[in-house]
Structures are given as C-alpha cells and as structure tokens.
C-alpha cells in the first residue's frame, strides 16, 4: 500500500495546497492520503486564521483522506522540530511517501538530509551573536552539501529530509515544484496561486469574499463567511501586554525558550510598544528572527513553560480531525498497527495527558477568541 503523507498548516487552505494534493493523488492512486496539520496555532507563532476543523474539512474536500492534528508541542516550533513531529507522526500512521512543495524539486533532498544528519551536534551550535541561528545554520548547510538552500520551502523540505534521515529514512521523499507566488510574497493579483501570507493579509484587511474566489475553495470561503472574528496578533496584543506586565521576571524565566535575558527585554519594551508589530521591532536583534520572537511571544501569552513542553513528549498522541470514506476504511483496517494513540474524543482523562493535555489547554484562549469549542464535544468530521 502506497500511503502518501503531507505535513501542512493550510493557513488558509488555498489553490497551491490543492495543486500539491493533486500531485499527491497521482502518487497514491487509490491508496489514502494522510495530512498531518497544525491545529489552532501555527509555526510562525500566531493563531491560525481559521479553526482546525474548518481547515481539515477543506483538505478532505480537496482530496485528502485523513487529517490528523500535529500537536502544539511540534507545530509551534522552528523548522527542525516541526519537521520531526510531522515525519514521526506520518511514519507512525503508516505513510510510506512524503510529498512536499519546494522551489526546485530537482534537488537531491534524501542525499542532503543524510549528509546533514551525520554532522556532530556540537558543530550545529553557534555563538555568533551578530547573526540569527537560522542564518548560521544555513551557512553551515551550504558548506557541508555544497549548495545554498535559502528559499523558505526548500529550507522546510531540507528539514523534512534531515528528520527522515534521523528516524532511519522510513519515508520516500517526493518533492514537487511549487507554482505561483512565493512563500511570503506580497499580493500578485495575476497569479493563479497566491501565497498564504498574502491571502491572510487580504482577509484581515476586509477583502470582499468575491475577491478571494480565484485562490480559495468555496468551502473555505463559506467558513470565513461564518466567522465573526479572524484571530490575529493585534487582537491578542492587549492580552500579551497584561501577561508581561503582571508576570514576574522569575515567572517569565520559566517560559519555553525564554533565554539570554529576553525576559528583561520583553518586560521593558512592552510598556513602550503601541501594538504588536511595534513590540517585535523593539525586541528584535540580529540574534533572533521575527518568527522566533513571535513564537516566544505566543509561549508567553499562553504561559507555556519549558516543563510543559518537555512533559508533553512523555505521551504523544494525535487528534483525528476529519476523514473520507477511503480514510475510514484505512483506519478500520490499520488502526491496530499504528504506533500512536489516535484521539477521536476528548474526555476528562485524556485531556490531562501529554501532548493532548497541552493542546487542550492552549486551545482555551482560541475558543474565547472565536467563540466555539475546539476539543470537548467535537468528533471527527466525515466528509464525502
């Protein structure tokens, strides 16, 4: 069985994702496509613009057969941990092939991943405070493999390859050339495929839904029509300000990835910042990327500590969000062989455990923003 896996955020689901899904179907044939998707919080350190259930439905309608949630402990992380979580979950769920979009599908990702995975860990630790960690890491990669990997999707593809190599290469890697606008490009109205960032900006700036029809599926547009609030950092900024002003330095030092005195910088600059974008500019330095600072801001807002994240890895599970008829058949046949707990219903007991426990806790704030329960009382969506 040639089960194909995809790691995604679908923030939101757009025509570029649909293109990749079609490419995955060419590989899978009649076998299932499994998508492991970020939940209500995404890698760049912010709330998803649409809840996980709506995005999962769009993925099934576009051709996926099963959508599982990538736990918060992996989803809101730098590329290496994000990729590790995605590849590990897909492997445990029986996937044999990983399809992902990149700027140049001719690159030998399996070879690159194998080379980089063999680099001793101490050579991946950098002390140049005039550059970000990611810049120094990319420079090291270029030296090791003789090829500069700088495009955002290629960097993520390389992270998948390294994660796969570290796990013993359980998945065949199938990179696919992206089409349309780049990862963080500004709006290109003539493009058939628009970047998710540009689409989010359109939505947050009040674009007419008719303006989005060429880039978003009808089901996704209908979901946005039902939303009263689109989550974003400017909406959350007052809560972050309260959190930073009310917490002690000692409390902030317990926050996941709070290091090198950033707790003092955060606490000092929050008083002066007019909004979240201004706050990020004030705390930005050559040492940290904006994504790193957004993630740290999110951990702070949600009071996610180092202990919370480390303890969550003691019991890793994944929530089933949506499935097709083909997906249901696959689950029935293969579930007993999965090397991971599948959560179809959140209850008082499992809501206290591992990755699910942290996920349920952080979703509480998302629920307050959008006004809808995200875990308790929800069951996987069957989409035909």
Curated annotation (Swiss-Prot):
Where, per UniProt, does this protein localize? Cytoplasm
Signal peptide boundaries: none
Top enzyme class, one word, equals: ligase
Q: What is its EC number?
A: 6.3.4.-
Q: Name one GO cellular component term.
A: cytoplasm
In its keyword annotation, does this UniProt entry include tRNA processing?
Answer: yes
Q: Which InterPro entries match?
A: Rossmann-like_a/b/a_fold, tRNA(Met)_cyd_acetate_ligase
| Annotated binding of ATP, by residue | 7-20, 101, 153, 178
Protein keywords: ATP-binding, Cytoplasm, Ligase, Nucleotide-binding, RNA-binding, tRNA processing, tRNA-binding
Main localization is cytoplasm
Q: Which SUPFAM superfamilies match?
A: Nucleotidylyl transferase (SSF52374)
Is-annotated flag, keyword Ligase? yes
| Domain of life according to the entry | Bacteria
Catalytic activity annotated for this protein? cytidine(34) in elongator tRNA(Met) + acetate + ATP = N(4)-acetylcytidine(34) in elongator tRNA(Met) + AMP + diphosphate
List, in alphabetical order, the Gene Ontology terms for molecular function in this entry: ATP binding; ligase activity, forming carbon-nitrogen bonds; tRNA binding
Question: Alphabetically, which GO biological process terms does the record hold?
Answer: tRNA modification
Q: What does this protein do?
A: Catalyzes the formation of N(4)-acetylcytidine (ac(4)C) at the wobble position of elongator tRNA(Met), using acetate and ATP as substrates. First activates an acetate ion to form acetyladenylate (Ac-AMP) and then transfers the acetyl group to tRNA to form ac(4)C34.
Q: Which family does it belong to?
A: Belongs to the TmcAL family.
Name of the protein this chain belongs to: tRNA(Met) cytidine acetate ligase
The organism encoding this protein is Lactobacillus delbrueckii subsp. bulgaricus (strain ATCC BAA-365 / Lb-18)
């Amino acid at each position: 069985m040639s089960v194909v896996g995809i790691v995604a955020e679908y923030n939101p689901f757009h025509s570029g994702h649909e293109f990749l899904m079609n490419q995955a179907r060419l590989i899978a044939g009649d076998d299932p496509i499994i998508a492991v998707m970020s939940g209500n919080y995404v890698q760049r350190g912010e709330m998803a613009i649409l809840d996980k259930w709506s995005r999962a439905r769009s993925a099934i309608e576009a051709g996926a057969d099963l959508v599982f949630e990538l736990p918060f402990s992996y989803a809101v992380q730098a590329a290496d941990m994000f990729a590790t979580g995605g590849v590990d979950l897909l492997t445990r769920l029986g996937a044999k092939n990983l399809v992902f979009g990149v700027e140049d599908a001719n690159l030998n990702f399996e070879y690159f991943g194998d080379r980089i995975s063999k680099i001793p860990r101490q050579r991946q630790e950098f002390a140049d405070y005039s550059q970000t960690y990611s810049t120094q890491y990319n420079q090291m990669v270029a030296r090791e493999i003789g090829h500069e990997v700088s495009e955002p999707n290629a960097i993520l593809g390389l992270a998948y390859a390294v994660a796969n190599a570290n796990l013993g290469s359980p998945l065949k890697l199938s990179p696919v050339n992206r089409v349309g606008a780049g990862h963080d490009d500004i709006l290109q109205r003539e493009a058939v495929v628009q970047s998710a960032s540009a689409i989010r900006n359109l939505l947050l700036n009040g674009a007419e839904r008719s303006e989005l029809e060429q880039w978003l599926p009808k089901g996704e547009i209908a979901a946005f029509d039902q939303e009263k609030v689109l989550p974003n950092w400017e909406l959350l900024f007052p809560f972050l300000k309260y959190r930073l002003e009310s917490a002690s330095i000692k409390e902030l030092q317990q926050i996941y990835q709070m290091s090198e005195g950033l707790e003092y910088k955060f606490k000092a600059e929050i008083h002066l910042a007019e909004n979240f974008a201004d706050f990020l500019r004030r705390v930005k330095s050559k040492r940290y990327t904006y994504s790193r600072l957004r993630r740290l801001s999110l951990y702070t807002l949600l009071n996610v500590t180092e202990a919370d994240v480390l303890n969550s890895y003691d019991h890793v599970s994944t929530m089933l969000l949506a499935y097709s008829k083909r997906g249901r058949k696959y689950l029935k046949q293969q579930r007993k062989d999965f090397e991971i707990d599948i959560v179809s219903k959140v209850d008082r007991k499992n809501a206290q455990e591992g990755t699910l426990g942290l996920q349920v806790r952080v979703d509480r704030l998302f629920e307050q923003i959008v006004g809808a329960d995200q875990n308790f009382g929800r069951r996987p969506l069957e989409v035909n």
